[in-house]
UniProtKB/Swiss-Prot annotation:
<dbReference type="InterPro" id="IPR006073">
    <property type="entry name" value="GTP-bd"/>
</dbReference>
<keyword id="KW-0677">Repeat</keyword>
<dbReference type="GO" id="GO:0005525">
    <property type="term" value="F:GTP binding"/>
</dbReference>
<comment type="similarity">
    <text>Belongs to the TRAFAC class TrmE-Era-EngA-EngB-Septin-like GTPase superfamily. EngA (Der) GTPase family.</text>
</comment>
<keyword id="KW-0342">GTP-binding</keyword>
<feature type="binding site">
    <location>
        <begin position="57"/>
        <end position="61"/>
    </location>
    <ligand>
        <name>GTP 1</name>
    </ligand>
</feature>
<feature type="domain" description="KH-like">
    <location>
        <begin position="352"/>
        <end position="436"/>
    </location>
</feature>
<feature type="binding site">
    <location>
        <begin position="10"/>
        <end position="17"/>
    </location>
    <ligand>
        <name>GTP 1</name>
    </ligand>
</feature>
<feature type="domain" description="EngA-type G 2">
    <location>
        <begin position="175"/>
        <end position="351"/>
    </location>
</feature>
<dbReference type="InterPro" id="IPR027417">
    <property type="entry name" value="P-loop_NTPase"/>
</dbReference>
<dbReference type="InterPro" id="IPR031166">
    <property type="entry name" value="G_ENGA"/>
</dbReference>
<dbReference type="Pfam" id="PF01926">
    <property type="entry name" value="MMR_HSR1"/>
</dbReference>
<dbReference type="InterPro" id="IPR015946">
    <property type="entry name" value="KH_dom-like_a/b"/>
</dbReference>
<keyword id="KW-0547">Nucleotide-binding</keyword>
<feature type="binding site">
    <location>
        <begin position="181"/>
        <end position="188"/>
    </location>
    <ligand>
        <name>GTP 2</name>
    </ligand>
</feature>
<feature type="binding site">
    <location>
        <begin position="229"/>
        <end position="233"/>
    </location>
    <ligand>
        <name>GTP 2</name>
    </ligand>
</feature>
<dbReference type="Pfam" id="PF14714">
    <property type="entry name" value="KH_dom-like"/>
</dbReference>
């Protein structure tokens, strides 16, 4: 089920991103320094008082004719429309400005719970300044210093108090997947074709409060799927154009809710930076991935076309070497019947557990093939390994010194584990930890 969503809004330079980072915590750290892995942190997941929620950072809004301001307002309006709770950030150092009043007028129209966070209240003497912000008519102001972490707990308490009631727990065996990709790659046609191919009765299921329609269906073997809709909001009746900022934001939300992501490419247009950016986020989030090349029927092909495409994909998505590639046509339904089985196989891979004894046999065999590296005369020693999580499969390798585990050797061990076990379509995480 969709997580509740919190939007952080305000004029430029009031510290929205600092507050966002403070709330998001470690979630926003970059896991892998790999080209194409997203660095865009407009969206993250946080947890407070055992309530999990999504947070969206937005650009600074101002009532001026500045470059890109219309796009920024547009993105912020979308975020506010999606949000269950809105955090309005202002600056205690500067007091109420015309831009603050402009944003406040936007917020009046949302009829959503508003948390007024007066940021940059960095010392106790400034706390009296917050009373001026009652004039905005948005309730009690919360004094905050995002830089020092002062007052953020009070803001989080207020957020949790205003979250919608928790939803019923979903069927744990259900596989959730989404189709992501640039506008016009044919996601909607693929969704319709997949549902038609399954010949099932599709039932729309509303999300928590945003009316983002998911579709639940069952295949011929009785496996239940939830297809997560990324087509946008319908609640307000508004139609939003596909600005990149918005499509990135909703793709991130869909990825976060998914077990498996179908990364859809357009055979007519090739691979773009947007594709790599979104695929990088799915990889970093540890999701199962299938690379789906749609509109395959539109290309003039020879015996090398598919091979050339595969080589190009592997070259441009090097960090997705584990992801299967399938060439399909939503129009002719070419190969679409294979997708549900691929999704099920990847879901099984994500949930695979390897007994420690078997895993350590593979590790020892790997060391025999390629001995552990040395650094300044000191050799890496691997004592044992164990699996600590699934979705994605995560392994901790206990060593004498963590810094002796070079990235290249960790990658070698990953490749050996992949050769020994079926982990198609899912990333696996290996973590070196010093044995105590």
């Amino acid at each position: 089920m969709a997580l509740p969503t919190i939007a952080i809004v305000g004029r430029p330079n009031v510290g929205k991103s600092t507050l966002f980072n403070r709330i998001a915590g470690e979630r926003i750290s970059i896991v892998e320094d790999v080209e194409g892995v997203t660095r865009d942190r407009i969206y993250a997941t946080a947890n407070w008082l055992n309530r999990k929620f999504s947070i969206i950072d937005t650009g600074g809004i101002d009532d001026v004719d500045a470059p890109f301001m219309e796009q920024i307002k547009h993105q912020a309006e979308i975020a506010m429309d999606e949000a269950d709770v809105i955090v309005f950030v202002v600056s205690g150092k500067e007091g109420i400005t015309d831009a603050d009043e402009y944003v406040a007028r936007m917020l009046y129209k949302t009829h959503k719970p508003i948390i007024l966070a007066v940021n940059k209240v960095d010392n106790p003497e400034m706390r009296n300044e917050i009373f001026d912000f009652y004039a905005l008519g948005l309730g009690d102001p919360f004094p905050v210093s995002s830089v020092h972490g002062i007052g953020t707990g009070d803001v989080l308490d207020a957020i949790v108090e205003n979250l919608p009631n928790e939803e019923v727990v979903e069927n744990p065996d259900m596989i959730k997947f989404s189709l992501i990709g640039r506008p016009n790659v044919g996601k909607s046609s693929l969704i319709n074709a997949i549902l038609g191919e399954e010949r099932v009765i599709a039932s729309p299921v509303a999300g928590t409060t945003r009316d983002a329609i998911d579709t639940v269906f069952t295949d011929s073997e009785g496996q239940e799927f939830t297809m997560i809709d990324t087509a946008g909001m319908r609640k307000s009746g508004k139609v939003y154009e596909n600005t990149e900022k918005y499509s990135v934001m909703r793709a991130m939300r869909a990825i976060d809710r998914s077990d498996v992501v179908l990364m859809v490419l357009n055979a007519e247009e090739g691979i773009r930076e947007y594709d790599k950016r979104i695929a990088g986020f799915a990889h970093e989030a540890g999701k199962g991935i299938v690379i789906v090349v749609n509109k395959w029927d539109t290309l003039e092909k020879d015996n090398h076309t598919m091979k050339d495409w595969e080589e190009d994909i592997r070259d441009q998505f090097q960090y997705l070497s584990y992801a299967p590639i399938i060439f399909v046509s939503a129009l002719t339904k070419q190969r679409l019947h294979k997708l549900p089985d691929m999704i099920k196989q990847i879901s099984q891979s994500q949930n695979t557990r390897i007994p420690s004894a078997v895993l350590n046999d593979v590790i020892m065999d790997a060391i025999a093939i390629n001995p552990t590296p040395t650094d300044k005369g000191k050799r890496l020693k691997i004592f044992y390994a164990t699996q600590v999580a699934t979705k994605p499969p995560t392994f901790v390798i206990f060593v004498n010194e963590e810094e002796l585990m070079h990235f290249s050797y960790l990658r070698f061990l990953e490749n050996q584990i992949r050769k020994a076990f079926v982990f198609e379509g899912t990333p696996i995480h290996l973590i070196a930890r010093k044995r105590k």
